[in-house]
């Protein structure tokens, strides 16, 4: 769920007429962050001086955290991503009569492995990309204690984030030094202001995703 906040109000540069036509044809959620910049954009966008946005909060209207929102306007896919894609997993579990609970990243961060210890299996969402040391510790401890960790997503466990000690709803991301990234942190800005820790990729922090789930994101084509 940290991914929902980090991508919150992502204004994509390719929001074109074809996208709007698809929204109308599918009767999808009609509003898009590109049209409502006064609510604040995502950490995949830029400030007016072209510096990358490194802070995000879910305590504001988030256009792309709504059922039926289409993330991608072109191509032959569903156009769904993150929350909307995850909702299909919930619907499938309900249709199959499989009981489940939802555990948020915040619960993992605050309660650690205790929040998931009593479960036999844990399945991630479709895009578990952003993590704190505490959430990774919880998942690793769950796995090492015999839990079945099912990773069916993509680009998981990639970026390190920090939460504000004064307001845990605030998330910070520093896109430093390497990796596929929307913008690059400037020299001297690789460390989080919230906790002083080195940011960037988990791989550069000694915890590549392969250590946790055996596979990890390396590169991408046109996106």
Residue ranges and their predicted role:
Residues 18, 36, 47, 122-123, ...:
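Alpha-helical protein-protein interaction elements
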Residues 78-165:
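Helical hinge/lid and interdomain linker segments adjacent to catalytic or ligand-binding clefts
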Residues 1-115:
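Aromatic-Pro/Gly-enriched surface loop or interdomain linker
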Residues 129-223:
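A glycine-rich, often tryptophan-bearing local segment used as a flexible ligand/cofactor-contacting loop or short
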């Amino acid at each position: 769920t940290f991914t929902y906040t980090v991508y919150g109000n992502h204004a994509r540069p390719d929001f074109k007429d074809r996208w709007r036509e698809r929204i109308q044809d599918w009767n999808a959620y009609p509003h898009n962050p590109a049209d409502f910049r006064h609510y604040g954009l995502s950490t995949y966008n830029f400030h007016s001086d072209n510096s990358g946005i490194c802070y995000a909060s879910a305590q504001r209207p988030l256009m792309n955290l709504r059922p039926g929102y289409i993330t991608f306007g072109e191509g032959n896919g569903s156009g769904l991503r993150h929350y909307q894609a995850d909702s299909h997993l919930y619907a499938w579990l309900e249709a199959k009569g499989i009981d489940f609970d939802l555990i948020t990243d915040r619960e993992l961060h605050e309660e650690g492995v205790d929040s998931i210890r009593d479960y036999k299996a844990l399945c991630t969402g479709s895009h578990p990309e952003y993590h704190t040391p505490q959430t990774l510790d919880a998942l690793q401890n769950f796995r090492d204690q015999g839990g079945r960790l099912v990773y069916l997503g993509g680009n998981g466990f990639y970026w390190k984030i920090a939460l504000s000690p004064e307001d845990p709803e605030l998330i910070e991301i520093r896109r430093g030094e390497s990796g596929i990234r929307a913008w690059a942190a400037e020299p001297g800005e690789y460390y989080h202001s919230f906790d002083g820790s080195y940011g960037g990729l988990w791989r550069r922090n000694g915890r590549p995703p392969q250590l946790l789930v055996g596979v990890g994101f390396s590169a991408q084509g046109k996106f």
